[in-house]
Amino acid sequence: MTSPIIVFDLDGTLVDTAPDLLDSLNHCLRTVCVPEVAPVEIRRYVGFGSRVMIERAFAAHGRPIDNEELDALQKLFIEHYTAGMPGLSRPFPGVMDALERFRSAGFIAAVCTNKLEDLSKRLLEALQIDERFAAICGADTFGHRKPDPRHLIDTIKLAGGDPDRAVMVGDSRTDIDTAKAAGIPVVAVDFGYTDRPVQEFEPSIVISHFDELTVELGNKLIKSAAGQAVA
């Protein structure tokens, strides 16, 4: 039987990347005289990759942007972000212990993120946790991205897992909608990057710390999704 798999979102779920994303975004905005984004506003911008972050920052100030300028600013963003990696980004409290718990229990682990694949791999490598994941799949890995359920399903398959024995962990409506569309149970963390409470999006369960993400919970969610009796 295929090993069960747990799939994580990256920004705002596994790793607190907000300070560095904000720094790179504001670096780009300064070059074109667009007002900077305040730290308290970052949750409105994260979730769909650097390109969308830039578009949203322009839209917030009624500033139009064409594809040529957007391409140039995204290139600048990536250069700035990569040069400072990992910067202030760190795994959220309890992440390392949770990864070890699930590894010891025989789970495969993978990452499904709307961050570009290369940036995702570089970040996790810089944090020395990349080898814990059988697959690290970004917005450009397959040609479709969250909330398209194929992004999650293809990540699971690339990691050697089975969508029928999978659970996802994320922090946003995008993650929750993706998992639901794929028919996969989803654990939502309430400390991530969303401007609305994750409870509103009706995930399978909400946790406030990775200590709550137990192997027993993962197995229970997988069995429940498969229609099996849960003790």
Predicted regions and their residues:
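Residue-level detector of anion-binding/catalytic polar loops
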Residues: P35, I108, P185
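Alpha-helical substrate-recognition element adjacent to the catalytic core
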Residues: T31-H61, N67, P93
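Conserved SAM-binding loop
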Residues: V7, L14, P91, A109-C112, ...
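An amphipathic alpha-helix signature
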Residues: L22, N26, G47, R51-E55, ...
